[in-house]
């Protein structure tokens, strides 16, 4: 299996350079499958507080119009109130939406209650994952604390 390559579009500069990015992918026959629009970083680069902002939606629609043969996935602070944003983009060709840990293929027929359920499940999974990592790394940190004390005592003797 060939790895799937994605390109993050997460800044005002990336949006500005999208034509040259897409041309390079095409000219060099790069195995890029998808563009991933990161609304959080994109909105920060534009100094826009709300990722649901109309300007962010317009930028996303513009990127979808230029996508060529690539899929486009959207992420960045997805929550239940993101449904109208995702729904509007689904009608323009959005392939998928994602949280940091879960990706969902979209469709024009996606219903609000299904979307809310998917987002809640994804966020619950991510929260469980983070708590698991925190517990695991906390235990590792305790082991390292013991090793640090052992080495420090060796250096003193």
Residue ranges and their predicted role:
Residues 1-157:
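Expand to "…catalyze enediolate/carbanion chemistry for C-C bond making/breaking, isomerization
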